[in-house]
Each structure stands twice: as structure tokens, then as C-alpha cells.
């Protein structure tokens, strides 16, 4: 599975029209995997996709017309990534690895969006979702 499909939203009708469908996995991967969490950069030009069982984060560039182009793939350093979360400033991406009971952190390169493992594992039992609170007023 691990297919990523983009759609155009018609605001007037509330309908969706399929634009593109691409695999979130490397072309040579033969095993089973499931795309799960998504994280979109603030400016909308980079999309990250978690792949369960393949235990990776696929990075795509998003074109002006919604085209998705594979850019890079990063190992989550965990098992069964359920979801992804970008920090509010876009400097870090977190992978919530459900079966390995941890959250891993990656720095986001401000130029090309590529990920680098920061190190350390935050132990959390079967993490599934993550949200950031707005700054205190």
C-alpha cells in the first residue's frame, strides 16, 4: 500500500479531484508497508510521510500544481511509525514509533527540508499522536 494521493479541493462544491498518486516507498522495496502519518511544512512545499513496517519517513517536494516528487527517505530509528509532527517553528520533525514505544527527533534542514537524526529516544508507551500548544500569552 503506502500510496500517497493528492487531490484538488473545489471550495464551491466541496468535492475532491484526484491529481497524483505516487508510492511512498523506494522502488526496490518488496515487503508490506502502510503509509500512516503526514506532516506538511509551513510553506507547503515539503511533505513528510511515515511508512509503517518499512520504518521510514519519505520526503516529497510539492509542486505548484500539487505534484509530488520523491526527495529523500530517512529511517525512523524506531518500529511502526504511527504519526509525524513538525515543531511549530518547523525546525524539528518527530516520529511517533508505536511498537518500539518511543518518539525520535530529527532536525529539518532549512534549505532542502532533509532530515537528520538528532539523537536520543523519548520513551512513551505506544505513542500515537502529538500536538503543540500555542505559546503562552
Predicted regions mapped to residue ranges:
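Acidic, glycine-rich loop-and-beta core segments that form the ion-binding/anion-interacting portion
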Residues: 1-26
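Blade-level signature of beta-propeller repeat domains, shared across WD40, Kelch, NHL, RCC1
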Residues: 98-110, 116-137
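Beta-rich, blade/repeat-based domains predominating
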Residues: 24-44, 77-91, 124-136
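Beta-propeller fold detector
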Residues: 16-24, 69-75, 115-123
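Short loop/turn segments immediately following beta-strands, especially the blade-tip
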Residues: 7-15, 60-67, 107-114
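Short loop/turn segments immediately following the C-termini of beta-strands
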Residues: 1, 9, 52, 98, ...
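Structural signal for beta-propeller blades
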Residues: 2-4, 55-57, 101-103
Amino acid at each position: 500500500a503506502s500510496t500517497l494521493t493528492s487531490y484538488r479541493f473545489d471550495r464551491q462544491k466541496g468535492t475532491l479531484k484526484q491529481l497524483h498518486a505516487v508510492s511512498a516507498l523506494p522502488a526496490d522495496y518488496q515487503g508490506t508497508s502502510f503509509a500512516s502519518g503526514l506532516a506538511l511544512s509551513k510553506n507547503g512545499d515539503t511533505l513528510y510521510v511515515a511508512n509503517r513496517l518499512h520504518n521510514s519517513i519519505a520526503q516529497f517536494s510539492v509542486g505548484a500544481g500539487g505534484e509530488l516528487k520523491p526527495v529523500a527517505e530517512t529511517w525512523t530509528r524506531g518500529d511502526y511509525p504511527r504519526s509525524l509532527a513538525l515543531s511549530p517553528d518547523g525546525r524539528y520533525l518527530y516520529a511517533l514509533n508505536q511498537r518500539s514505544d518511543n518518539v525520535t527527533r530529527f532536525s529539518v534542514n532549512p534549505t532542502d527540508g532533509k532530515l537528520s537524526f538528532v539523537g536520543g529516544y523519548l520513551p512513551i508507551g505506544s505513542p500515537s499522536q502529538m500536538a503543540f500548544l500555542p505559546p503562552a500569552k
